[in-house]
Amino acid sequence: MANEIPDLECQVRAGTGKGAARAARRANLVPGVVFGGDADPLAIQIPYNVLLKRLKAGRFKSTLFNLKVEGHDDVRVICRDVQRDVVKDLPTHFDLMRLRRTSKINLFIPVEFINEEECVGLKRGGVLTVVRAEVELVVTAGDIPEKLTVDLTGKAIGDVIHISDVTLPEGSKPTIDRDFVIANISAPSGLKSADDEAEGEDAEEAAAE
């Protein structure tokens, strides 16, 4: 299922080189360039506040965007670099790369948990503890999944859900090789306390013997 790709609206930048870049910054714009995809590089610029907001939101360099530039066809891009001022740590330039539908990219995909009402552990008062709300996958640009689905049907207290338990979209794989944890069904705090007390009593009895 294709994800809804966010738009990134930029403007064509008049001229290239340091002079044009400085002129853009004086106008409160951040200069950039989009390259790749069997097309010539295109000098672009984006309002400073717009880029800063995107950067603060996170995942800017791992989000697929639909680049919209007046006078040019929309194209899918991903950020390859954001240069920053060494003193102020604020963006001074950015690079975007055009993608083909067959391009492989790393993206964070959200995880959705379904059938909570069929989860035995939750019915008994257990708590769903989400370790990873997103998972970074290597995906194909033309077939980006909207989400990963975890079915909680039949899960009991103490069950741990690993990435190997999740059906991944065809052609995608995690960026991490190990079988990491997505979530678990933990015991309610009251039950944990009772178990801890019982374990403590058992230990005391064993010591007395």
UniProtKB/Swiss-Prot annotation:
Keywords: Ribonucleoprotein, Ribosomal protein, RNA-binding, rRNA-binding
Region span, Disordered: 190-209
Residue ranges with Acidic residues bias: 196-209
Pfam families: Ribosomal_L25p, Ribosomal_TL5_C
Annotated GO CC locations: cytosolic large ribosomal subunit
Domain of life: Bacteria
GO molecular function term, any single one: 5S rRNA binding
GO biological processes: translation
UniProt xrefs under CDD domains: Ribosomal_L25_TL5_CTC
Assigned protein family: Belongs to the bacterial ribosomal protein bL25 family. CTC subfamily.
Role description: This is one of the proteins that binds to the 5S RNA in the ribosome where it forms part of the central protuberance.
HAMAP family on file: Ribosomal_bL25_CTC (MF_01334)
Subunit field text: Part of the 50S ribosomal subunit; part of the 5S rRNA/L5/L18/L25 subcomplex. Contacts the 5S rRNA. Binds to the 5S rRNA independently of L5 and L18.
Name of the protein in its database record: Large ribosomal subunit protein bL25
UniProt lineage: Bacteria, Pseudomonadati, Pseudomonadota, Alphaproteobacteria, Rhodobacterales
UniProt gene name: rplY
